[in-house]
């Protein structure tokens, strides 16, 4: 048997100085392969490389293999399906997916949609649907699949064949308001019984899938889930890998040995505007990255029509040419047809041109790529699900817009293609041999064979063997018993002389929860390498830090009470300096009721500045996912985290939280407020299973905490309650505060009374956003029911009859407290921390941002003057008396 020269090695390193010696070495390896197999050959080669390096030879490491399929023809398993029937089913789905998008855009070009992405990946999905992806049943938890967002039309088209969606549903693709429509992309919020995971914007799916696979192992290790052979599949595009989130976490699943994780990257070589790597090879680039990280890499580049040509490639010229061509050329080979490919690919060497001399231009154009060959794809999937010890990535080469012909196949404009004319549609029909008439093409009629047809029976039988229809999503599970408010008694009582922060109050609440025999095992504490910052190190010993391998070393602080304890059954997810990954773990835990049929309750605590601001897109996806859990913004408040300065001081997380519709945001000052909020959150999310989540800002400032006032719990949850009533007086002001600035508000009330004889009522506002949410809802109802009795919002009802003016101060931007201006029954002045943060002590910072007690008092006096309660000279005298510089620059400009 002739042995081909190895490429690209010789193609890039010059001529072989001793071909005879080279041939002897190659024949030796051939002999080992024949007699002892590939594993022995691999072992010998590794030993030789190691020996050469130890002997002083410089051997640069290359993580790339030849530009060929990883699985040779001889190692492909038998295909278990009927390819004839499967081709027809795939063709019907292709047609219906295309018709759905074109139909919508015939109505209006506003709707958009994507044809080309699913066209390139249809075979990748169909092999999975027919042979691999198990739906959840009573006996098996089911596989989890992150579908590439732009391929949603194909998933809908399959569901239509299965009878899960109707023709009316398809007709209302991307029209969810006016009819029974389908969401543009996978959105559990919009289709809660269909889609499991939101995968757009691009790049979110890969990281979420990684942490989902790890969380599955976490649940198994802790005995919450039975150990099963479930897999997490993630589909993404080659262009999508440019997103930092797509590649940023790929070393973690190798460390964790997540062989339950499979990535399928659809390498159609094109992104939205043009080639992904026109001057290079994206498959080789991705192979190097994943191989270097330690993944099992399977390349599916060439379809079966190339196999005979490769078998005849005795001199290695075909493989050499495959290596030499860049992706921009490969795109042209499919866009410009067989004659072009004959000239520019096979025409590089006379021997190659002779190899295809008996092939027509059409034959050459039909030389297929691996991602469109079900047998090659099945071989890759089969190898992936059976691989042990490492995650697998499958790099499947496809053609973007496959089947669209001149309308968009392999063309740069194909991603934006929403419409096809009648001739294009006929060409598509003929190419896939669809039983669709010219009249049906004009009408864009969907095709669905009869229920007793061979195809429909096959389609349903395959899914029945895999547990049922897919995708599918659970919406409710058995509720857990939630502790009553009295459970948190220690935080509801006065602390006396003891001073501590709301962060420490949270840690005590969390510690009590993990100790509870009922709900405790389902609590999932998540920290991004800040447990000691937040005073949580006591939990290290108590519940342990999860580690898939346990603890293989003696920790440096093993002689301490709170030593760093890692354990296979550890409860804490210690994610390192990694807010994106931490949040993905939070999503995995917060959706476990749906993905795994068991409730877990994540508590993710982090520097508040590095939350929504850092991973806002993931936070939005968390809301879309219907995640349930708690986000704790630690060291919150622009002046409360004093010395850390500009990049750390958070003055807007409470505002950003309001942008996510199902997020409930609170800014408590006292331990009892925090306890009331967390207990009610558990009740709503865990017992009543509402699809909401909580953002709570907690601080690192120590002070004494009073007891829960009688009757205050309802006001705490609704957003505000009266904390202290001022004495009698002709004039009066209402002071509102939240978080630690509430204490400055209380001090300002004392100052107003003591120095100026003006009493003040003080209100604790735990959530301006909840007050606004209620008020907007009431306003809307009143607007739509003009003849009904007018409803009154909670904030209006609470402040009705109060003698003003009203002054609000927070440690956040002024717009946070400004949210309720419309419903405050009097003059309303707001103070906040607009501007960049800076390093200094709390007193200095509060003076700088004008949220200290003196500034609050002056704001109150100024408002009284505007209302005619005091003269302006009184305000001027107060400014001088309190030592405030009226000419200092506005802090927002500094």
Q: Which residues are covered by each model-predicted region?
A:
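A structural-propensity feature for long, helix-poor, extended segments
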Residues: 234-235, 241, 617-638, 643
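Beta-strand segments within the central parallel beta-sheet cores of soluble alpha/beta enzyme folds
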Residues: 138-148, 169-175, 225-235, 263-265, ...
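Thiamine diphosphate
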Residues: 2, 19, 175-198, 204, ...
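N-terminal amphipathic, basic-rich helices that act as targeting or association modules
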Residues: 2-162, 428, 499-516, 520, ...
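Non-catalytic terminal/interface segments that mediate subunit docking, oligomerization
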Residues: 76-97, 118, 133-136, 143-144, ...
């Amino acid at each position: 048997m002739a042995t081909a020269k190895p490429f690209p090695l010789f193609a890039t390193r010059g001529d072989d100085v001793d071909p005879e010696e080279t041939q002897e070495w190659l024949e030796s390896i051939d002999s080992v392969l024949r007699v002892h197999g590939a594993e022995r050959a691999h072992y010998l080669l590794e030993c030789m490389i190691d020996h050469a390096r130890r002997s002083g030879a410089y051997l640069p490491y290359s993580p790339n293999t030849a530009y060929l399929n990883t699985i040779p023809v001889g190692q492909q398993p038998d295909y278990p399906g009927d390819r004839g029937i499967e081709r027809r089913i795939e063709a019907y789905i292709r047609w219906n997916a295309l018709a759905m998008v074109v139909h919508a855009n015939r109505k209006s070009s506003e709707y958009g949609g994507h044809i080309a992405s699913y066209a390139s990946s249809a075979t990748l999905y169909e092999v999975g649907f027919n042979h691999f992806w198990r739906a959840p049943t009573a006996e098996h938890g089911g596989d989890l699949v992150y579908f590439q967002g732009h391929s949603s039309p194909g998933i809908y088209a399959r569901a239509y064949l299965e009878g899960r969606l109707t023709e009316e549903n398809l007709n209302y693709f991307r029209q969810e308001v006016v009819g029974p429509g389908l969401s543009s992309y996978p959105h559990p919020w919009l289709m809660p019984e269909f889609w499991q995971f939101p995968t757009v914007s691009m790049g979110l799916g890969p990281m979420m899938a990684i942490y989902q696979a790890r969380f599955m192992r976490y649940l198994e290790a802790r005995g919450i889930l039975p150990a099963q052979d479930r897999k997490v599949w993630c589909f993404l595009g080659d262009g999508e890998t440019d997103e930092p989130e797509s590649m940023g976490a790929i070393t973690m699943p190798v460390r964790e040995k997540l062989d339950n994780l499979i990535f399928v990257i659809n390498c159609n070589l094109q992104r939205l505007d043009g080639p992904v790597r026109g001057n290079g090879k994206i498959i080789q680039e991705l192979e190097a990255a994943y191989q270097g990280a330690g993944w099992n890499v399977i390349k599916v580049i060439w379809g079966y029509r190339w196999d005979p040509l490769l078998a005849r490639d005795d001199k290695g010229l075909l493989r050499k040419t495959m290596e030499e061509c860049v992706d921009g050329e490969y795109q042209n080979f499919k866009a410009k047809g067989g004659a072009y490919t004959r000239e520019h690919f096979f025409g590089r060497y006379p021997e190659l041109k002779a190899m295809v001399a008996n092939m027509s231009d059409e034959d050459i154009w039909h030389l297929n790529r691996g991602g469109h060959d079900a047998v090659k794809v099945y071989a890759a999937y089969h190898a992936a699900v059976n691989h042990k010890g490492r995650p697998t990535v499958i790099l499947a080469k496809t053609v973007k817009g496959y089947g669209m012909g001149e309308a968009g196949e392999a063309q740069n404009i194909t991603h934006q293609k929403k419409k096809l004319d009648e001739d294009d549609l006929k060409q598509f029909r003929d190419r896939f041999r669809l039983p669709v008439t010219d009249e049906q093409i004009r009408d864009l009629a969907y095709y669905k064979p009869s229920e007793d047809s061979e195809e429909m029976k096959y389609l349903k039988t395959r899914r029945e063997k895999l547990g049922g229809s897919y995708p599918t999503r659970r919406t409710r599970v058995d509720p857990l018993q939630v502790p009553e408010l009295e459970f948190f008694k220690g935080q509801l009582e006065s602390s006396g002389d003891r001073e501590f922060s709301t962060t420490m109050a949270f840690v005590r609440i969390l510690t009590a929860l993990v100790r509870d025999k009922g709900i405790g095992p389902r609590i999932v504490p998540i920290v991004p390498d800040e447990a000691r910052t937040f005073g949580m190190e006591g939990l290290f010993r108590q519940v342990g830090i999860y580690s898939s391998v346990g603890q293989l070393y003696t920790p440096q602080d093993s002689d301490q009470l709170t030593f760093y304890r890692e354990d296979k059954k550890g409860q804490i997810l210690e994610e390192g300096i990694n807010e994106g990954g931490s949040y993905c773990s939070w999503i995995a835990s917060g959706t476990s009721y749906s993905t795994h049929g068991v409730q877990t309750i994540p508590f993710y605590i982090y520097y508040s500045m590095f939350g929504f601001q850092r991973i806002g897109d993931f936070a939005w996806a968390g809301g879309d996912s219907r995640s349930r859990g708690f986000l704790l913004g630690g060291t919150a408040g622009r002046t409360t985290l004093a010395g850390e300065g500009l990049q750390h001081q958070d003055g807007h997380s409470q505002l950003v939280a309001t942008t996510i519709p199902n997020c409930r945001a609170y800014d408590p000052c006292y331990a009892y407020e925090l306890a009331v909020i967390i207990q009610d959150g558990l009740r709503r999310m865990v017992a009543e299973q509402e699809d909401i989540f909580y953002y709570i800002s907690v601080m690192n400032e120590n002070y004494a905490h009073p007891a829960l006032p009688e009757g205050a719990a309802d006001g705490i949850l609704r957003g505000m309650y009266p904390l202290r009533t001022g004495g009698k007086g002709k004039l009066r002001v209402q002071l509102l505060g939240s978080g630690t600035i509430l204490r400055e508000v209380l001090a300002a009330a004392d100052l107003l009374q003591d120095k100026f004889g003006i009493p003040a009522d003080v209100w604790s506002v735990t959530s301006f956003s909840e007050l606004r949410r209620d008020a907007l809802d009431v306003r809307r109802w009143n607007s739509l029911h003009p003849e009904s009795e007018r409803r009154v919002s909670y904030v209006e009802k609470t402040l009705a009859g109060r003698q003003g003016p009203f002054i609000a101060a927070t440690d956040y931007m002024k717009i946070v407290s400004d949210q309720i201006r419309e419903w405050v029954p009097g003059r309303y002045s707001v103070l906040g921390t607009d501007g960049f943060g800076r390093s200094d002590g709390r007193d200095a910072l509060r003076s700088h941002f004008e949220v200290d007690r003196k500034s609050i008092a002056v704001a109150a006096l100024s408002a009284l003057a505007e209302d005619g309660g005091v003269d302006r000279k009184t305000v001027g005298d107060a400014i001088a008396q309190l030592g405030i510089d009226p000419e200092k620059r506005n802090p927002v400009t500094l």
